[in-house]
């Protein structure tokens, strides 16, 4: 079991404990994407008006753009021995790291709920196939309890789940995918030309699918020896992210014709129909897939809550996160598709500038060990200003659409602007201070 104290999050991992095998980097970036989320995302592209070819292009471009910052962030863990939020205090300061850490905690709670809705739906169907019945709240509670226990035990148990449960899920979903494709007809051409605004919006959803892991990345590389090759870490992380997200989303494209709507209920019904008498295998895989993803969410959320300034034992943070995720999932179960797309897009508006600053500081700043700034730094101000302006001007969702997004016909470029503006602003300021 990982150390339960708040200090284990705020302080670097001792060198004696940095013994994690390097292959875990691949599994920790591969397994959390194994689930109906990627499938739903691929099917969602068809409902947005993309055909198969433009959908594949959006999937490849969006996932590569989203995965690169995550992979580069993963290499920060071994040298610092810190979680991703704690590592960002170099640029933001001890006080300045609290807003993004708190946002990340809320973000993890939301993903907890989003992931558990299809898993609980699958578990209910699985129980019905076995002659049992359970209400949604009970099925959800069973899954949330298992995920919470994994996060209570911490990093090492979470990593084991990613490797061994992830390998099992990979084989199962490959079989499901093959069966689904044999029962489906791909939408090879669109009934009307795909507008560039629609393509940008679709690409943005796909960028966020991978970029959303940026705030987790070094959480699961900090137990590697400090001497581990950064190039190897980046390569393994990139392979894991792209190797799971791209195939699953393309499967969603290929099987969209057999899915009534881009929702977990429709995906599950399609799986059951295609798999026939062994449909329970598909149901079990979907239910189990939430454990790989949400053990990540709950564990990282417990880290983030401590980084946000609530210095409670890690177990208390994990229990609080899982409990709130459960409540949100019960409350929002009937609005999955809209919640899913809005959540993917809205979270980008703070993650993009934050990770832009973190990467600019690490790769272009001075890595000489220095005391962590105790208060609010220039980097924290850049993060706050860029995030607010990005949301106010560029955001596109059912919640709010900014004036620039309206002028562009609904195209969403806010995350690109936020990332590059924050990174350049921070890097240029750091260079001018160094030269002076």
Task: Show which residues each predicted segment covers.
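C-terminal membrane-solvent junction of multi-pass transporters and transport-like membrane proteins
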Residues: 16, 355-428, 432, 436
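Membrane-water interface regions at transmembrane-helix termini and the short interhelical loops
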Residues: 47-48, 75, 99, 121-130, ...
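Transmembrane alpha-helical segments of multi-pass small-molecule transport proteins
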Residues: 101, 128-153, 167-178, 203-217, ...
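Hydrophobic alpha-helical segments and their helix-loop junctions in multi-pass secondary transporters
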Residues: 151, 167-192, 207-211, 251-258, ...
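Membrane-interface "cap" regions at the ends of multi-pass membrane proteins
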Residues: 1-53, 198-204, 222-232, 433-435
